[in-house]
Swiss-Prot record:
Disulfide bonds join 29-54, 33-50. GO terms for biological process: protein insertion into mitochondrial inner membrane; regulation of multicellular organism growth. The twin CX3C motif contains 4 conserved Cys residues that form 2 disulfide bonds in the mitochondrial intermembrane space. However, during the transit of tim-10/tin-10 from cytoplasm into mitochondrion, the Cys residues probably coordinate zinc, thereby preventing folding and allowing its transfer across mitochondrial outer membrane. It holds the Pfam family zf-Tim10_DDP. Heterohexamer; composed of 3 copies of tim-9/tin-9.1 and 3 copies of tim-10/tin-10, named soluble 70 kDa complex. The complex associates with the tim-22 component of the TIM22 complex. Interacts with multi-pass transmembrane proteins in transit. It is a peripheral membrane protein. This is Mitochondrial import inner membrane translocase subunit Tim10. Mitochondrial intermembrane chaperone that participates in the import and insertion of multi-pass transmembrane proteins into the mitochondrial inner membrane. May also be required for the transfer of beta-barrel precursors from the TOM complex to the sorting and assembly machinery (SAM complex) of the outer membrane. Acts as a chaperone-like protein that protects the hydrophobic precursors from aggregation and guide them through the mitochondrial intermembrane space. Its main location: mitochondrion. GO terms for molecular function: metal ion binding. It is found in: Mitochondrion inner membrane. Belongs to the small Tim family. The gene is tin-10.
Length: 86
């Protein structure tokens, strides 16, 4: 059973990972979609569409990876329990 300290540590790691993902997504999508020489104070329609697609792809990949890692982790846990029972 997880203690409060362990749960707090897990929550802290989740926040850190989400912050890192957000930072990487922001940097990657900005570099890809927004020109370094600003001509207008607002985003152009093309920039806005590019950012929307970039963020959507980033989040989609993040979700798919999370599901895949969870299933792999559960498979590993089941295998370890099976070995421990033998």
């Amino acid at each position: 059973m997880a203690t409060d300290a362990q749960m707090a540590q897990v929550a802290e790691l989740e926040v850190e990972m989400m912050s890192d993902m957000y930072r990487r997504m922001t940097n990657a999508c900005q570099a890809k979609c927004i020109a370094t020489a600003f001509k207008e104070s607002e985003l152009t329609k093309g920039e806005a569409v590019c950012l929307d697609r970039c963020v959507a792809k980033y989040l989609d990949v993040h979700e798919k990876l999370g599901k895949r890692l969870t299933s792999m982790s559960q498979g590993d846990e089941a295998a370890l329990q099976k070995i421990a029972q033998q």
